[in-house]
Curated annotation (Swiss-Prot):
SMART domains: PKS_KR (SM00822). The keyword NAD does not apply. One of its GO terms (molecular function) is NAD binding. Substrate binds at residue 148. It comes from Brassica napus. One of its GO terms (cellular component) is chloroplast. The gene is bkr4. This is 3-oxoacyl-[acyl-carrier-protein] reductase 4. GO terms for biological process: fatty acid biosynthetic process. It is found in: Plastid, Chloroplast; Plastid.
Length: 254
């Protein structure tokens, strides 16, 4: 009966969540996890419209609500339009997960410095700033920024990526201090090597080398990261956690 079903499903106030870079990988897993948990999810993508639509469709199949929004998080106009889309549709924004640009490339050219900074750091700043304006009015909100273990320990050939991700950690600590008086929690999640299209393409030698650096001896799954993000985004038990960096990397940064 309906009553039994209602009892089985815990009541959630359907928080409104914006997930950037949500068409694949970690972002997709986060969007699906939050959608399944009863959130209304804006699925942001930069180029992969078809994949993003699929994510939205899956959330709707779970009985959730979702909309897709194509936009570049390193462009202020796109970010403002994205937040406005969520507010126009659902009236508010409760949670923002800044995941766009979280691609762990093995090597990066120096010429890509600005591009990597714009996507990984400026994007987090712009999205956080736009969301905070909305959250401050209602004195409540949660922001989760996806950084990388590389931002903590560095990696040869990834100076730009490491600098951007370390920047996200420093930025988040400041944002947590600034948002605390308005009940806005800001935390960081630092994934290590997570199984993806890219790890699947690595040669056997490279894979062996990488797995050798991971004490648990395996890649993480996008769902591992999504589970931690869901806790930080929705759980009442996370309400007293702010300004913290959570490493989910199989032990790389021990």
């Amino acid at each position: 009966t309906t009553t039994e079903e209602e009892e089985a499903v815990p009541k959630v106030e359907s928080p409104v969540v914006v997930v950037t870079g949500a068409s694949r990988g970690i972002g997709k897993a986060i969007a699906l996890s939050l959608g399944k948990a009863g959130c209304k999810v804006l699925v942001n993508y930069a180029r992969s419209a078809k994949e993003a639509e699929e994510v939205s469709k899956q959330i709707e199949e779970y009985g959730g609500q979702a909309i897709t929004f194509g936009g570049d998080v390193s462009k202020e106009a796109d970010v403002d339009a994205m937040m406005k889309t969520a507010v126009d549709k659902w009236g508010t924004i409760d949670v923002v997960v800044n995941n766009a640009g979280d691609t762990l490339l093995i090597r990066m050219k120096k010429s890509q410095w600005d591009e990597v900074m714009d996507l990984n750091l400026t994007g987090v700043f712009l999205c956080s700033q736009a969301a905070t304006k909305i959250m401050m009015k209602k004195r409540k909100g949660r922001i989760i920024n996806i950084a990388s273990v590389v931002g903590l320990i560095g990696n040869i050939g990834q100076a730009n990526y490491a600098a951007a991700k370390a920047g996200v950690i420093g930025f988040s600590k400041t944002a947590a201090r600034e948002g605390a008086s308005r009940n806005i929690n800001v935390n960081v999640v630092c994934p290590g090597f997570i199984a993806s299209d890219m790890t699947a393409k690595l040669g056997e030698d490279m894979e062996k080398k990488i797995l050798g650096t991971i004490p648990l001896g395996r890649y993480g799954q996008p769902e591992d990261v999504a589970g931690l993000v869901e806790f930080l985004a929705l759980s009442p038990a996370a309400s007293y956690i702010t300004g913290q960096t959570f490493t989910i990397d199989g032990g790389i940064a021990i």
